[in-house]
């Protein structure tokens, strides 16, 4: 087992530590909570049958996944000690997205962040901004991280705007590092440090 921060990992279940609560955010009926094994069927059926092509484009993944692939990935993610896998739940109970802290290095106190909303109808409503800020706060308040980082493609300016609003800063560009159809595009690197997050919280 990897080095686990004993301050924030409060409850040991099987081979993974959990916080003493699964829910990290609630707003207007929307909830962000840790994923559970019981969610896997709904996760697949509500979001991968079929997967929105724009989601595939903006995340760099393929457009079609088998049920076996999704189930295997989902359940494996729950077992990883360096990942917090949160689901974004709509007021009607449907899973509409995910917000993930992964690749956690407890010694360096750094991690990667990614987020995705699966349904086009839910985009542009501020849900992604809210979920990003809630997950960011969890990373620094509960996990006591020093650095949270991400990458975003240059053809996804809406996401970059969300990250900038949440306090992430551009720190580099991998030029022509990916393909958008038949064209090259940039991969933009961004991060936020704990001191920057503290200043941001004091200003709001």
Language-model region placement:
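Conserved GNAT acetyl-CoA-binding A-motif
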Residues: 141-151
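Acetyl-CoA-dependent GNAT
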Residues: 63-121, 193-194
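A short, well-structured alpha-helix characteristic of acyl/acetyltransferase catalytic modules
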Residues: 2-67, 71, 196-204
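Conserved active-site tyrosine of GNAT-family acetyltransferases
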Residues: 163, 168, 190
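Glycine-rich acetyl-CoA-binding "A-motif" of GNAT/NAT acetyltransferases
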Residues: 94-97, 158, 184
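Conserved acetyl-CoA-binding loop-helix of GNAT-fold acetyltransferases
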Residues: 118, 124-138, 160-165
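Short glycine/proline-centered loop/turn elements that form peptide/ligand docking sites
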Residues: 128, 132, 155-159, 176-181
């Amino acid at each position: 087992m990897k080095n686990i921060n004993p301050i924030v990992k409060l409850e040991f279940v099987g081979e993974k530590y959990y916080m003493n609560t699964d829910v990290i955010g609630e707003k207007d009926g929307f909830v962000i909570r840790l994923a559970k094994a019981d969610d896997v069927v709904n996760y697949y059926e509500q979001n991968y049958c079929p997967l929105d092509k724009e989601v595939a484009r903006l995340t760099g993944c393929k457009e079609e996944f088998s049920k076996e692939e999704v189930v295997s990935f989902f359940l494996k993610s729950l077992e990883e000690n360096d990942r917090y896998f949160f689901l974004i739940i709509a007021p009607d109970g449907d899973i509409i997205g995910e917000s993930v802290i992964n690749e956690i290095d407890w010694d360096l106190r750094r991690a990667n962040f990614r987020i995705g909303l699966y349904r086009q109808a839910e985009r542009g409503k501020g849900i992604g901004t809210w979920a990003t800020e809630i997950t960011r706060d969890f990373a620094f308040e509960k996990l006591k991280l020093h650095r949270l980082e991400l990458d975003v493609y240059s053809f996804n300016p809406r996401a970059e705007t969300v990250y900038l609003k949440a306090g992430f800063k551009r720190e580099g560009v991998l030029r022509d590092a990916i393909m958008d159809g038949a064209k090259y595009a940039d991969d933009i690197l961004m991060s936020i440090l704990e001191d920057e997050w503290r200043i941001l919280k004091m200003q709001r």
